[in-house]
Amino acid sequence: MSSKQEIMDDQRFRRVSKDPRFWEMPEKERKVKIDKRFRAMFHDKKFKLNYAVDKRGRPISHSTTEDLKRFYDLSDSDSDLSDEESKILSQKKAKQKKKQTKKEAKSIEKPIEEKKKETKKTDQKDSINKHDLNNSERVQKMKNSQKPQKIDSEISPKKDNEEFLQNKKKKRGTTDLSVEALPKGKLRTKDSSTSEMVKSSTMSSSKAKREKQSVVPVIMAKDNDGKMPDEDALEEDSDSASELGSDEESEDEIISDGKTSADEDESEEEDEEEEEDSEEEEEEEEEDESDSGPDLARGKGNVETSSEDEDDLADLFPEEPGFEHAWRELDKDAPRADEITRRLAVCNMDWDRLKAKDLLALFNSFKPKGGVVFSVKIYPSEFGKERMKEEQVQGPVELLSIPEDAPEKDWASREKLRDYQFKRLKYYYAVAECDSPETASKIYEDCDGLEFESSCSFIDLRFIPDDITFDDEPKDVALEVDLTAYKPKYFTSAAMGTSTVEITWDETDHERITTLNRKFKKDELLDMDFQAYLASSSEDEEEVEEAPEGEEGVNIGEDGKTKKSQKDDEEQIAKYRQLLQVIQEKEKKGKENDMEMEIKWVPGLKESAEEMVKNKLEGKDKLTPWEQFLEKKKEKKRLKKKQKALAEEDSEDELPSDVDFNDPYFAEEVKKIGIKKKSMKSAKDSASSEEETDLEKQKAEMALLVMDEEEDSKKHFNYDKIVEHQNLSKKKKKQLMKKKELVEDDFEVNVSDARFQAMYTSHLFNLDPSDPNFKKTKAMEKILEEKARHRERKEELLIQAVERAQQDTGKPTQKQPMDPALSMLIKSVKNKTEQFQARKKQRVK
């Protein structure tokens, strides 16, 4: 306090008391007010939790009630109740303290009382020894007195009753004298002599009573002659024994009064202590119960205790058989060993879905650097072999026990199926072989107990000793996995994943379903056909070699037939291979040539092409386009004149059908015509060589005319309209077609025209499709295609030039290449022929 006052008196810290920034939050604002319904959390044991260690591991003694009191407080309306409760709690604490003090006092008094009891026991033993003699004499007298009574009772029962009453009175007198002889004041004293007397009398009377009860039935059981007595005699004897017992009980009561008077103070104190203990226990039980009544959430207060109702329910609903499944405890019986080996066993997995490649991919992802997993093999277990043999004959045993009329939602049948699925996990086991024990231990540490994807099947790994070998054939083997092409499996185990169990005994293989539903590519289908239908020659040779030697001497005719059939099969296989190779080559060519073109050479065009080449070499093609046009027109006129002349000659040669050749006039005329024909034939024969050359020229000219027929039908066009109509929808085009206003784009560009070659080479005429002024028309598309071809040609020429340069350096004496101008000319001719064919197709349409 003095230090605080010094700090507050210091001028530097005075403003701390006045500045609100340094004030502490008041308790009313710091604590959250709660309703009286939640007051039990301050004192109820359910909400109490003791902390032994703090968050940093240091030992502390702290509880949750302190935290609750720190942050919560009852509202003002419930503060009175909280005061009352605090009083009750204080009372309870005081009682608990009393209990503790009493227990401590009892623990101190116990050794003193034990010493007193030991002294009393020694005194009692002395008194008992004295009275044992008297009791033994009394028992003998009773035996002697009862024997003649049994005989007399058979003759006269009245005498027996009178004698018994007299004996009874005598005994009462003795007991009265013995009690009256003692002074009354001394009964409640604590002297050793009186207490010994009282205790000895009580002990002797109780012992005598026991001896009588044990001896009397034995005496009454048999007569002196060894015969059983009558029922009347037995009844009388039992009455007499009961009367004797009652007399002795009265004596015991008198003695016990003396005893109680002596020990009354001690018994009262003990009773008070017992009552207090019982009250305290009841209070503790009441404390255990929460103030809010039964806590149904924690399972308190909702238990019915009526046994009759339970019996009735048991009669109505008989107990169902219990099923204990090994949830996550399938490896509880596995022995533990410290030895680490390089082989691992994988157990208790869903083997209907998992394959060896899945496990190999998993282990490869967890192996250490430099570690190798050689293989994963799946073997059938002994248990699995036995069960699978049974299932082949009669199916699963669990299914046989389920009735056919059982409903689908029957719990017992469902749990039987679940039990079968759990057993099915043990049908197989996998063996993973690693390069060293270090890789195996690393995989074991990372993967043991791990869930495979989201399948609810957990990996159970175990080390396999080196001396164990596996003779069975593996079900599945995986040596390598392509992790780039591997696709993981997503599934849930039928036994552990869902409440409704799906049996997997007769289930189709999921890989088969996926392969059948998958869309295959052409290459994959061809590979599958090769694998399915074609066998390699090496396999055939092996099969022939494996044939047993004993069968070599079989019928020769049969061997010949088999050889022929084998040859036929081989021939068919060879043909099939050739067909497949041809198909594959065609597909490869189609893939290589992105621009698929078909060039057809029509017979007769070859000659025209040769003439064009000659004209080119002679220099005739150097004419201007206008001059070429005029020459073509002249040639057309010449051809027309020739055709007319031929037609006139044919008309002259023709004669009417009604002409009578017997008439002398017509006969002379016919002779004249024959002479003319002969003269014409002779003239033709003379000029046959010249005509042949002319005919060849005519053919070339006809070809040129056919190519340029459409040039006569040239017309003007509106470029803007063509662009507009090209971008219209189908409906609007149909409307314009009806009105005959649709402008069709019939314009075809002569791409091979030499005047426009700069469009393909110069950057000044480059076409930019991304430009807003660019209009996509048929002509533009052709120009772009031609430009792409020019680029390809340039690349080819460059490659050829490089190859030639290499060849020239290596082989200087090689032929010179063809003139590039000629090669370009040939290419242009080919292009023209293609255009010609395209026009022909349009005409046909």
Curated annotation (Swiss-Prot):
Q: What processes does the entry annotate via GO biological process terms?
A: rRNA processing
Q: Where do Basic and acidic residues bias regions lie? A: 64-73, 102-140, 149-166, 558-567
Sites bearing N-acetylserine, chain numbering: 2
Bias (Basic residues) ranges: 90-101, 634-644
Phosphoserine: modified positions: 75, 77, 79, 82, 136, 156, 200, 290, 292, 306-307, 608, 651, 657, 686, 688-689, 729
GO cellular component labels: nucleolus; nucleoplasm
Q: Which residues form a coiled coil?
A: 775-803
Give the matching InterPro entries: Esf1, NUC153, RRM_ESF1
Annotated compartments? Nucleus, Nucleolus; Nucleus, Nucleoplasm
The UniProt regions of compositional bias labelled Low complexity, in chain numbering, are 194-206
Q: Which Pfam families match?
A: NUC153, RRM_ESF1
Concerning PANTHER family, the annotation shows: ESF1 HOMOLOG
Q: How does it assemble?
A: Interacts with ABT1. Forms a complex with ABT1 and suppresses the ABT1-induced activation of polymerase II-directed transcription in mammalian cells.
- Indicate what this protein is called per its UniProt record: ESF1 homolog
Q: Which organism is it from?
A: Mus musculus
Point out the gene that encodes the protein.
Esf1
